[in-house]
Regions:
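Gly/Ser-rich "nucleophile elbow"/oxyanion-hole loop immediately N-terminal to the catalytic nucleophile
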Residues: 71-76, 139-145
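Alpha/beta-hydrolase active-site loop
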Residues: 122-143
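Short beta-strand element of the alpha/beta-hydrolase
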Residues: 54, 75-88
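Short amphipathic alpha-helix adjacent to the substrate-entry channel of hydrolases
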Residues: 95-112
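Short N-terminal helix/helix-N-cap motif within the alpha/beta-hydrolase-1
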Residues: 91-95, 121
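N-terminal cap/lid segment of alpha/beta-hydrolase-fold proteins
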Residues: 1-75
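Short beta-to-alpha linker loops that shape the active-site pocket of alpha/beta-hydrolase fold enzymes
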Residues: 87, 110, 115-119
Length: 145
């Protein structure tokens, strides 16, 4: 006898896009340093996945015998929450609280976990500049994600 258990919860699929480089800077020693962020997104359908990750199938081209195709739906606009770990600029993995903040993505928000330079990599206001740069990057690339 088979029994199907329905937990009664319909949760969206949550994706974590990691290592999105938003800035190239130098540390205090002059060595190059890539600053990156992670983006946690709730995806509602496969169309959103294709928009972000690309489609591996060749695109169909309509010809004179086929009906015109409808315009592709626009990406849903979501508010973005930027998350900076409270580490006193001592250095910590930006993704250490992903599981704790999954509820925000389930509620429909996009959550950006942003890496900023530690105090060993740059003196204040370098961290504020990094935060502003991350905001500019997200605004400029909002349509991509």
């Amino acid at each position: 006898m088979r029994t199907t258990i329905d937990p009664g919860i319909d949760r969206p699929t949550i994706f974590l896009l990691d290592h999105i480089v938003y800035s190239h800077v130098q540390n205090l020693g002059g060595q190059p340093l890539d600053l990156d962020l992670s983006l946690m997104l709730p995806l509602q359908n496969n169309g959103e996945m294709r928009r972000i990750f690309g489609n591996n199938q060749p695109e169909e081209r309509p010809d004179a015998t086929t009906a015109p195709q409808a315009a592709k739906p626009a990406a849903p606009e979501r508010p973005v929450i930027l998350w900076f770990n409270g580490n006193g600029f001592r250095g910590i993995d930006k993704n250490c609280q992903v599981a704790d903040l999954e509820f925000l993505a389930e509620a429909g928000y996009a959550v950006a976990f942003v890496q900023v330079r530690s105090s060993a990599q740059g003196h204040l206001p370098a961290q504020l500049i990094d935060a502003k740069t991350a905001i500019r990057f997200l605004r400029a690339n909002a349509g991509k994600y």
